[in-house]
Amino acid sequence: MKKLAFIGVLTLLMSFNGIAQQINWVTFEEALELQKKKPKKIMMDVYTNWCGPCKMLDKNTFQNPDVAKYVNANYYAVKFNGEGNDVVKYKGNTYTNKGYKPEMASRRNSVHDLTYAFQVNAYPTIMFFDEKGDIITPVRGYQNPQQLELYLKMFLNDSHKEIKTQEEFNAFYTAFKPEFKG
């Protein structure tokens, strides 16, 4: 009986250990409000419901325990549907998707005004913002955990401010040693 109880407890502990850490996603407006209390940079995943690489980014990169832990500790993470129907307030403007069609929610839909304002023209795009909510830069396309790690660390430490040329970025990229497991 004691053996059975021990096996049950051991199984329970192992199942808790196997639960992957998740990114704590918030809305863009929530992230901007949180910045007022505790300044952090923002990482925004601009995705669509129909985008295959967006789904790969979710599954392979954002569910990676190293990515989730690092993002949660250092960034406010935002998921924004680039073709969704959310009403978003940013920098004194209100952004909507006037052409949104609910029946097209899982297919290509009208592009959200905020997506246009950020000049996002490819999905997925990961937008990075500084502690004041100003855009640092977009990073277009699928990123595996190690590729995203480079940008997460570069922007967190403001290393990007020292990089002025493509050659300097190439040197930074070459010297970077990823630590995230893939």
How would you label these PLM feature ranges?
Residues 55-59:
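Detector for the c-type heme attachment site
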Residues 49, 82-83, 132, 144:
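Solvent-exposed coil/turn segments that connect beta secondary-structure elements
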Residues 38-52, 77:
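Short active-site neighborhood of thiol/selenol oxidoreductases, capturing the structured segment around
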Residues 22-25, 64-106:
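Thiol-based oxidoreductase modules, predominantly thioredoxin-like and allied folds used
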Residues 24-41, 71:
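A short beta-strand-turn-helix
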Residues 43, 113-117, 122-138:
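A short, hydrophobic beta-strand/beta-hairpin element that forms part of a small beta-sheet core
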Residues 1-22:
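Bacterial Sec-dependent N-terminal signal peptides
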Residues 21, 119, 130, 136-182:
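Non-globular targeting/processing and membrane-anchoring segments
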